[in-house]
Amino acid sequence: MTDSAAEPTISQPQHVVIYTDGACKGNPGPGGWGALLASGGTEKEIFGGEMGTTNNRMEMTAVIEALAALKKPCTVTLYLDSQYVLKGITEWIHGWKARGWRTAAKAPVKNVDLWQRLDALLVSSGHSIDWRWVRGHNGDPGNERADALANKGVERALGRL
C-alpha cells in the first residue's frame, strides 16, 4: 500500500517538527505522499505512493505515516498545506464521530478509512500536536521538501524509482 524510505526511525524526541504534503497526477490518479521530520538536528525523510488515489488521500497518508514514524509520545509541530486535513482534524472530526462518521448533511464522510486511522493514531500515540497551516508552493523550505518527497512518491507509484 505505502512505501517509505529505509532510514532509521526517530526514537524518542522531545519535540519534532514535521512537514507533510501529498501529490496526485490526475485526481484520481497515481499519487504520492512525503514527510520531513526534524528533531534535535536529526532529519528523516519518508515518502510513498499509490495508484488510483486522490490528492486528499495522499495529504492524509503523509500525516498518518509521519506520526506513525514517531515511536514514543512527543510534542509535534506539524506543518501542512492542506486545509482539508487541517479543518478535518481540528474542526470537523468531532461532529463526524458524534454523527456516526456522517457529515452535517448526513452523507458518509469521504476517506473515512483514513480519518478513522488518523483518529485512532492520535488517541493511541500520546502525541501533543500543534497543527499549523502553511501556504503551499510559496517558498517555505520545509513545505518545498515535503512536496518534492510527495512527487518522489508519485514516481515510485509509477515504478520509476
UniProtKB/Swiss-Prot annotation:
**Residue span, RNase H type-1 domain:** 12-155
Q: Highest taxon of the source?
A: Bacteria
Q: State where Mg(2+) 1 binds.
A: D21, E59, D81
Gene Ontology biological process: DNA replication, removal of RNA primer
InterPro entries, alphabetized? RNase_H, RNaseH-like_sf, RNaseH_domain, RNaseH_sf, RNaseHI
Please write the reaction equations for the catalytic activity of this protein: Endonucleolytic cleavage to 5'-phosphomonoester
Q: Which GO terms describe its molecular function?
A: magnesium ion binding; nucleic acid binding; RNA-DNA hybrid ribonuclease activity
Q: Which residues bind Mg(2+) 2?
A: D21, D147
Cofactor(s) needed for function: Mg(2+)
PROSITE patterns, per the entry: RNASE_H_1
Tell me where it resides.
Cytoplasm
What are the EC numbers? 3.1.26.4
Q: Which GO terms describe its cellular component?
A: cytoplasm
Is the Cytoplasm keyword given for this protein? yes
Bound how, and how many: what does the cofactor note say? Binds 1 Mg(2+) ion per subunit. May bind a second metal ion at a regulatory site, or after substrate binding.
- In which broad location class does this protein mainly occur, judging by the first location in its UniProt entry? cytoplasm
Alphabetical UniProt keywords: Cytoplasm, Endonuclease, Hydrolase, Magnesium, Metal-binding, Nuclease
Per the UniProt record, one Pfam family is RNase_H
Assembly state and interactors? Monomer.
What is the stated purpose of this protein? Endonuclease that specifically degrades the RNA of RNA-DNA hybrids.
NCBIfam families registered for this protein in UniProt: PRK00203.1 (NF001236)
The entry's family comment says: Belongs to the RNase H family.
Name of the featured protein: Ribonuclease H
The species this protein was found in: Polaromonas naphthalenivorans (strain CJ2)
Which gene does this sequence derive from? Answer: rnhA
